[in-house]
């Protein structure tokens, strides 16, 4: 039996390569539907579900068809998204392959807007890579999820990454009442409120 010193790194790289191939194949089939939608991501420790849901409901009430991706449910207009299996969604923010499929279904259904929760885990694991965001919203940052991030600095960096990847034409909205609010939107390419 051959033993490699860095077997964990080799496996991690293989998984990354395999994931990239899977995403590439998905994009060949579906294209990048997020480019044809106005996708607004909401990140923060608390308030993601409420904020995304309210934006979805308000936009729908104004006569625009929108989608919602979050912890509680995924909605395409007012219809609940039917996953490929009967299992519930495993995380707040689905992986990039699943997101591409969901965005494609939303686009086919006539959605103009998508409001989605963007978790720190998703940002750290690059689950929103390639999503063309029209805007990003920061709610707050508290000392939750430190089991995953180890300390508040790592948690902050994971959330901040979201605002650094927003395109120039997007917008950033940050809660200035939160002690991390102003720092969260530094080093961004888009306008911030």
Q: Where do the language-model regions lie?
A:
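Short, basic phosphate-binding NTP loop
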Residues: 1-41, 50-67, 101, 160
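Acidic, Mg2+-coordinating active-site environments of NTP-dependent enzymes
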Residues: 35-37, 109, 134-193
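Residue-level signal for inorganic ion chemistry
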Residues: 42, 69, 99, 117, ...
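Short beta-strand-centered segment that lines the nucleotide-binding/catalytic pocket of NTP-utilizing
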Residues: 63-77, 119
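Hydrophobic anchor at the start of a short beta-strand
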Residues: 66, 113-114, 191-192
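A short acidic, helix-capping loop that chelates divalent metal ions and anchors anionic groups
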Residues: 76-80, 84-86, 144-149
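Conserved nucleotide-sensing/catalytic segment adjacent to the nucleotide-binding pocket
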Residues: 85-116
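Conserved helix/coil segment N-terminal to the catalytic DExD/H
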Residues: 121-129
């Amino acid at each position: 039996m051959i033993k490699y010193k860095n077997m964990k790194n080799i496996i991690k790289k293989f998984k990354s390569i395999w994931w990239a191939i899977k995403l590439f194949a998905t994009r060949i089939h579906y294209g990048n539907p997020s480019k044809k939608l106005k996708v607004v991501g909401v990140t923060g420790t608390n308030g993601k579900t409420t904020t995304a849901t309210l934006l979805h409901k308000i936009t729908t009430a104004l006569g625009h068809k929108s989608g919602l991706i979050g912890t509680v449910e995924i909605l395409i207009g007012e219809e609940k998204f039917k996953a490929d299996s009967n299992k519930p969604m495993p995380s707040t923010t689905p992986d990039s392959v699943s997101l591409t499929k969901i965005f494609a279904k939303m686009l086919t259904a006539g959605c103009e807007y998508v409001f989605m929760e963007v978790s720190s885990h998703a940002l750290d694991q690059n689950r929103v890579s390639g999503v063309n965001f029209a805007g990003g919203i920061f709610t707050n940052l508290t000392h939750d999820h430190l089991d995953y991030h180890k300390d508040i600095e790592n948690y902050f960096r994971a959330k901040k990454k979201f605002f650094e990847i927003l395109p120039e034409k997007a917008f950033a909205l940050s809660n200035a009442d939160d002690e991390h609010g102003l720092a969260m939107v530094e080093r961004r390419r888009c306008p911030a409120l």
